[in-house]
Curated annotation (Swiss-Prot):
One of its GO terms (biological process) is tRNA methylation. It comes from Gloeobacter violaceus (strain ATCC 29082 / PCC 7421). The lineage of its organism: Bacteria, Bacillati, Cyanobacteriota, Cyanophyceae, Gloeobacterales. Its EC number is 2.1.1.74. GO terms for molecular function: flavin adenine dinucleotide binding; tRNA (uracil(54)-C5)-methyltransferase activity, 5,10-methylenetetrahydrofolate-dependent. This is Methylenetetrahydrofolate--tRNA-(uracil-5-)-methyltransferase TrmFO. It is an enzyme of class 2 (transferase). It is found in: Cytoplasm.
Length: 449
């Protein structure tokens, strides 16, 4: 008899993981703490509740979120099938009627003959068996302590204080230059030099920019922000503060002038391929529109493509590159898997992708079969590759974006044509992957009128 897989957490990732296990013929015990223990962000006890927006993002497959959704359709995702069935008009996005979407998702998962839904809070790491952790950004305190004990101190974060990330190909290389401070070691940073007038204009805009409101439960835990001040708060402390902090220019010689600039913003490489660049020291709580307006004032970033904007919010996530394999198994505990936002992906569709892989692999392990690794040419595979192979020292949650994919050679200069090529390669790879491993389509669901 096949042992049941434990899935802890009934959000988007957990619901998908449980369904994929059951679909493979493996029994599942799905534990969801609501309504026994309410969450500060949820409003119902339904599975897969959408806490923030009701949108899964762009539908077009020449956009990263849309490509990821199409890959998941071809892999047989239940969550995406239910979302498609209950879509509401939203321009080019997949938005859903939350009430009917969560109701149908809950009914389908709870009524599956191989899924036992338990309304219970799990406070300890199960001592044995195959377990999928899908507890999300609001993991309960007792279980978070258990994960911390399992993984080691320092490998579980409780707040996401992240700087913006830009696509390297969108930088103006006539203005930025590669160098390390005092030319020590290899030229590892892109540097954006500022004159005094440029710095003054930037400082004034940053100090007066509008911040996002923290949610009520984030106000209660604001102590987590103390060690990681937002860049706009530094600006408000005085005109010179940034020049002695993240914008200090010492040791950075501008090749255009032969001198140190008045101030300098540094960008650090975020991925192995050097296609993603992080604004060093720019953790921020500014509204997203304000971030683009202010940060595009930085010389060289006028046309920057932001693949992730800065955030400061409550978000429990693992240092996945240190802990997880590309199968989403823990290196040190291969019968334990993790998925969703807990692993450091960002966004609803990325959580579904993690749930799909963790559920599929948990089922295969239960059947004594080898777990799967998604092709890195796919958006789903590129996300998992990022969370399992990123730099542990600088790891921050990441949404789907084309800069995660391996470059196509020779490089296609036209941006739209390049995105089409990424899409075509990814969908061909996911189709081959599905055929190779016998992965069928999702259940046919009637579309709501």
């Amino acid at each position: 008899m096949i042992e049941p897989v434990r899935v802890i957490g009934g959000g988007i990732a957990g619901a998908e993981a449980a369904w994929q296990c059951a679909r493979a013929g493996v029994p599942v015990v799905l534990s969801e703490m609501r309504p026994v223990r309410p969450s500060p962000a949820h409003h119902t006890d339904h599975l897969g509740e959408l806490v923030c927006s009701n949108s899964f993002g762009a539908m077009a497959t020449d956009r990263a979120p849309g490509l990821l959704k199409e890959e998941l359709r071809r892999l047989g995702s239940l969550v995406i099938a239910v979302a498609d069935a209950h879509a509401v008009p939203a321009g080019g996005a997949l938005a859903v009627d939350r009430a009917v979407y969560t109701r149908e998702l809950t009914e389908r998962v709870a009524n599956h003959p191989l899924i036992e839904l338990r309304r219970e809070e799990v406070t300890e790491i199960p001592a044995a068996g195959l377990v999928v952790f899908a507890t999300g950004p609001l993991t309960s305190e007792p279980l978070a302590h258990g994960l911390q004990a399992l993984t080691g101190l320092g490998y579980l974060s409780f707040f996401d204080a992240a700087s913006p990330i830009v696509a390297g190909e969108s930088l103006d290389t006539e203005k930025v230059f590669l160098a390390s401070r005092y030319d020590r070691g290899e030229a590892a940073y892109y540097n954006c030099p500022m004159s005094e007038p440029e710095y003054r204009a930037f400082w004034e805009a940053l100090a007066s920019a509008e911040q996002a409101e923290l949610k009520e439960f984030e106000h209660e835990e604001r102590k987590f922000f103390e060690a990681c001040l937002p860049v706009e708060e530094l600006a408000r402390r005085g005109y010179e503060t940034l020049r002695y902090g993240p914008l200090k220019p010492v040791g950075l010689t501008d090749p255009r002038t032969g001198r140190w600039p008045f101030a300098c913003v540094q960008l650090r490489q975020e991925d192995r391929a050097g296609r993603l660049w992080n604004l060093v020291g720019f953790q921020t709580n500014l509204k997203w529109g304000e971030q683009k307006r202010v940060f595009q004032m930085i010389p060289g970033l006028e046309q920057a493509e932001f693949v992730r904007l800065g955030v400061m919010h409550r978000n429990t996530f693992l240092c996945s590159p240190h802990l997880l394999a590309p199968t989403l198994q823990f290196h040190a505990h291969p019968r334990l898997l993790a998925c969703g936002q807990l692993t450091g992906t960002e966004g609803y569709t990325a959580a579904v992708a993690g749930g799909w892989l963790a559920g599929t692999n948990a089922a295969r392990l239960a059947q004594s079969r080898d777990p799967l690794v998604l092709p890195v040419e796919t958006m789903a595979g590129a996300l998992v590759d990022y969370v399992s192979h990123g730099d542990p020292k600088t790891f921050q949650p990441m949404p789907p974006n084309f800069a995660l994919l391996p470059e196509i050679t020779p490089r296609i200069r036209h941006k739209q044509q390049r995105y089409w090529a990424y899409r075509d390669r990814a969908l061909a790879a996911i189709d081959t992957f599905g055929r190779t491993h016998g992965l069928g389509a999702a259940p046919a669901l009637a579309r709501a009128n």
